[in-house]
């Protein structure tokens, strides 16, 4: 059984993002109150706030953890047009004795001229790299050449998406058969027919990111996007949060069938589409094996989705924040108590905000 445990977050405004660290024992939250809070899970399973500080001069849209191989490192992004990198300092201070940790700003990334709407660390096999996207339609990729010096970041790539960007997701695959890839979503609500999801792939020859050829047909505003962890699959799975939940597969077309040196072509199939939230969906998040997807919407529920042996996706659980039973929980499958073990592994946020992201 899932047990709902309420946490008095003590944020003074809307919470926009919740992010778990790699091990699922630390959590970061960010809010329109311009602060980030870090929470640690005790042996008894309770969450305690061990750090809280003002991070930006505007609403903080997203917060994300680096892989622990690089230390205890966070990145945040804000309406104030910046992204920031933070590192936890472990010392002999009295703070630690009082159960408090100390976080130091290592760098501020100031290249964007508009609201920075998402920030994500690259998969660890790529080194310490960070991607941001902003309301002006530009994805920027930074690298820390010396992982021991987080105050130095160099801008490696700027990718123009032609549409206001709302969210990004790195493809986590570490297979040499797959080039680094990043998916970008747009919440542009103008009625133009441009696809709201774009895929960019790194080209070893040009050393640049190029738009992959995809027939991605999403035209509704996209609030969140997430590649599934890839455990040996030859294709990729991408989840999208828009007015509903959508799951796509991306299968690379064989190299000999594509033009030499040209952009990779992908065969795109929509394998699931669910409007069970009956509202805007704000976050999608995979478990660590890429087999269970969690989505959260304006209906106040987190819904869990899983494919059966026939590759048919079904709802396998519905969670409501206050722990009350959910009407219509029999929709699209039944609750499955065995999924309880997936919760610590649900990487990144499950709590979206219906406030949207204001563009400067």
Swiss-Prot record:
What keywords appear on the UniProt entry? Answer: Cell cycle, Cell division, Centromere, Chromosome, Chromosome partition, Isopeptide bond, Kinetochore, Lysosome, Membrane, Mitosis, mRNA transport, Nuclear pore complex, Nucleus, Phosphoprotein, Protein transport, Repeat, Translocation, Transport, Ubl conjugation, WD repeat
Its primary localisation, in coarse terms, equals nucleus
Note down the stretches annotated as region Disordered.
324-360
Give the position(s) of the covalent cross-link described as Glycyl lysine isopeptide (Lys-Gly) (interchain with G-Cter in SUMO2): 12
| InterPro entries to which the protein is assigned, alphabetical | G-protein_beta_WD-40_rep (IPR020472), Sec13/Seh1_fam (IPR037363), WD40/YVTN_repeat-like_dom_sf (IPR015943), WD40_repeat_dom_sf (IPR036322), WD40_rpt (IPR001680)
Activity regulation annotation text = The GATOR2 complex is negatively regulated by the upstream amino acid sensors CASTOR1 and SESN2, which sequester the GATOR2 complex in absence of amino acids. In the presence of abundant amino acids, GATOR2 is released from CASTOR1 and SESN2 and activated.
One Gene Ontology BP term is: protein-containing complex localization
One MF annotation (Gene Ontology) recorded for this entry:
structural molecule activity
Q: Which residues carry this modification: Phosphoserine?
A: 179, 190
Out of the domains of life, which is the source?
A: Eukaryota
State any GO CC term: nuclear envelope
Q: Where is the composition biased (Polar residues)?
A: 324-354
Q: Which Pfam families does this chain map to?
A: WD40
Give me the WD repeat coordinates as residue ranges.
10-49, 55-96, 111-152, 160-210, 217-258, 276-315
Q: Where in the cell is it found?
A: Chromosome, Centromere, Kinetochore; Nucleus, Nuclear pore complex; Lysosome membrane
- Subunit and partners: Component of the Nup107-160 subcomplex of the nuclear pore complex (NPC). The Nup107-160 subcomplex includes NUP160, NUP133, NUP107, NUP98, NUP85, NUP43, NUP37, SEH1 and SEC13. The SEH1 subunit appears to be only weakly associated with the Nup107-160 subcomplex. Component of the GATOR2 subcomplex, composed of MIOS, SEC13, SEH1L, WDR24 and WDR59. The GATOR2 complex interacts with CASTOR1 and CASTOR2; the interaction is negatively regulated by arginine. The GATOR2 complex interacts with SESN1, SESN2 and SESN3; the interaction is negatively regulated by amino acids.
The similarity comment for this entry is:
Belongs to the WD repeat SEC13 family.
Describe the task this protein carries out: Component of the Nup107-160 subcomplex of the nuclear pore complex (NPC). The Nup107-160 subcomplex is required for the assembly of a functional NPC. The Nup107-160 subcomplex is also required for normal kinetochore microtubule attachment, mitotic progression and chromosome segregation. This subunit plays a role in recruitment of the Nup107-160 subcomplex to the kinetochore.
What's the protein called, per UniProt?
Nucleoporin SEH1
